[in-house]
Regions:
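Metal-dependent phosphohydrolase cores
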Residues: 1-100
């Protein structure tokens, strides 16, 4: 997933967490939800690692940790470790989508 869409996904997750539970929202809420449910999402290993990193930065530093310069650099670092495309062997309905 390109940097811009992966970053938009992170923003969408933070926004949803704030809007659906405004009274009990904490920065770690979004990170915890993602870790718990990410295995059910179709996403590449690189995207998973990037989103996880962004949400951890948000949890620890708030929006200050999600500056464009930092997120673009981290995305490039993560993207360099993985192939540009990944093929899922099948649509597994009863197993985790992200192995591990």
């Amino acid at each position: 997933m390109p940097w811009i869409y992966a970053t938009e996904y992170v923003c969408d997750m933070i926004s949803a967490s704030k809007n659906y539970n405004p009274k009990n929202f904490k920065p770690e809420t979004t990170y915890d939800y993602f870790i718990k449910h990410a295995k059910n999402y179709y996403m590449s290993q690189g995207t998973y690692e990037y989103v996880k990193w962004c949400l951890a930065r948000y949890r620890d530093l708030g929006f200050k940790g999600l500056k464009k310069k930092d997120t673009k650099a981290k995305y490039a670092e993560i993207a360099a470790k993985y192939p540009r495309t990944e093929m899922l062997t099948s649509m597994r309905l009863s197993e985790d989508l992200i192995p591990g």
